[in-house]
Amino acid sequence: MSRAIAADKREDDSQFDSTLRPKSLDDYIGQEKIKGNLRLFIEAARGRGEALDHVLLYGPPGLGKTTLANIVACEMGVNLKSTSGPVIERPGDLAAILTNLEPHDVLFIDEIHRLSHVVEEILYPAMEDFQLDIIIGQGPSARSIKLDLPRFTLVGATTRAGLLSSPLRDRFGVISRMDFYTHDELATIITRSSRILGMEIEPRGADELSRRSRGTPRIANRLLRRVRDFAQVRADGVITRQVVKETLALLEIDEMGFDHMDRMILLTIIDKFSGGPVGLDTIAAAISEESDTIEDVYEPYMIQNGFLNRTPRGRVATLAAYEHFGRSVPAAPQAALL
């Protein structure tokens, strides 16, 4: 069973997300610094009649990178072509996409960190010189020809900016980090989504749902779907604070937005390893989960909210984690926790 609070994309999210997705920077809620910068750069590019400089958006999943790519295309008044790193397996795949772009079009590559090295080599001159180097023939008779490309904007999105090669990262003129959303921003997003879907939600209901959505709009909108179902069947269609609490209790999501797996990770560190430090591989073995999954999917939210520390010696549960679960802090590590 998939996690209701997983921030990764799912097939059943696509139609729902497209309905709720804002179409302009004015409608986009949150990420104020990024919005302000993009608004300035877009206005300048349009004023000069040029393509926008290449944009790299990085940060945890579900924060709106794809939405911003769509908005960039809309604000520039151009087409958007979308693909992802794993899909572009060969240089020919990328060449086919690039040669079909119109002037000033936006090419969006999700999971850009997963591009192969050989595909990246094709992308470098395309981004920098708007030229495509193609090898014709094989062996001694092989020759290279250059094809001119229309000036386009590449918008790359990644959850793991550290895996991008330096040559690729250096070719982006605009690099922006997406941050988790505040409770107030999420409550506004939830209220907006409810209005679009024709649902009645009370302010306290939106606030309660925002506090359990892990700072992530995708999770907030997904949980809103589940709350809508509950409200429709058991609460006359009105989403109140109590409806939200009862729905999320059924989904085993607590007041911090932790689900069963989050609690298992933290309680394993606290109960089995005296709060840590404990190695990531040891935690993974103890709960039968992949180390990469723990590090990339579960830990960021815990660290962001001060429930977990990464140290050179391993993971350490913080004082906040002990208090959240009503556990007594061991005497020895207490100073480190404080």
Curated annotation (Swiss-Prot):
The protein's matches in SMART domains, at most eight in alphabetical order, are given as: AAA (SM00382)
The UniProt catalytic activity note for this protein reads: ATP + H2O = ADP + phosphate + H(+)
GO terms under cellular component:
cytoplasm; Holliday junction resolvase complex
Q: What is this protein called?
A: Holliday junction branch migration complex subunit RuvB
Its EC top class is hydrolase
Q: How does it assemble?
A: Homohexamer. Forms an RuvA(8)-RuvB(12)-Holliday junction (HJ) complex. HJ DNA is sandwiched between 2 RuvA tetramers; dsDNA enters through RuvA and exits via RuvB. An RuvB hexamer assembles on each DNA strand where it exits the tetramer. Each RuvB hexamer is contacted by two RuvA subunits (via domain III) on 2 adjacent RuvB subunits; this complex drives branch migration. In the full resolvosome a probable DNA-RuvA(4)-RuvB(12)-RuvC(2) complex forms which resolves the HJ.
What lineage is this protein's organism placed in?
Bacteria, Pseudomonadati, Thermodesulfobacteriota, Desulfuromonadia, Desulfuromonadales
One GO BP annotation is: DNA repair
Q: What organism does the record attribute this protein to?
A: Pelobacter propionicus (strain DSM 2379 / NBRC 103807 / OttBd1)
- Location of the region described as Large ATPase domain (RuvB-L) in the Swiss-Prot/TrEMBL record: 1-181
Domain comment in the entry: Has 3 domains, the large (RuvB-L) and small ATPase (RuvB-S) domains and the C-terminal head (RuvB-H) domain. The head domain binds DNA, while the ATPase domains jointly bind ATP, ADP or are empty depending on the state of the subunit in the translocation cycle. During a single DNA translocation step the structure of each domain remains the same, but their relative positions change.
Q: What does this protein do?
A: The RuvA-RuvB-RuvC complex processes Holliday junction (HJ) DNA during genetic recombination and DNA repair, while the RuvA-RuvB complex plays an important role in the rescue of blocked DNA replication forks via replication fork reversal (RFR). RuvA specifically binds to HJ cruciform DNA, conferring on it an open structure. The RuvB hexamer acts as an ATP-dependent pump, pulling dsDNA into and through the RuvAB complex. RuvB forms 2 homohexamers on either side of HJ DNA bound by 1 or 2 RuvA tetramers; 4 subunits per hexamer contact DNA at a time.
Keyword Secreted in annotation:
no
Record-linked InterPro entries: AAA+_ATPase (IPR003593), AAA_lid_4 (IPR041445), DNA_helicase_Holl-junc_RuvB (IPR004605), P-loop_NTPase (IPR027417), RuvB-like_N (IPR008824), RuvB_C (IPR008823), WH-like_DNA-bd_sf (IPR036388), WH_DNA-bd_sf (IPR036390)
Q: Which family does it belong to?
A: Belongs to the RuvB family.
Q: Binding residues for ATP, per the UniProt record? A: L20, R21, G62, K65, T66, T67, E128, D129, F130, R171, Y181, R218
Enumerate the PANTHER family for this protein.
HOLLIDAY JUNCTION BRANCH MIGRATION COMPLEX SUBUNIT RUVB (PTHR42848:SF1), PTHR42848
Q: What's the Enzyme Commission number for this chain?
A: 3.6.4.-
Which residues lie within the region annotated Head domain (RuvB-H)?
255-338
What keywords sit in the KW lines?
Answer: ATP-binding, Cytoplasm, DNA damage, DNA recombination, DNA repair, DNA-binding, Hydrolase, Nucleotide-binding
Alphabetized SUPFAM superfamilies for the sequence: P-loop containing nucleoside triphosphate hydrolases, Winged helix' DNA-binding domain
The principal location of this protein is cytoplasm
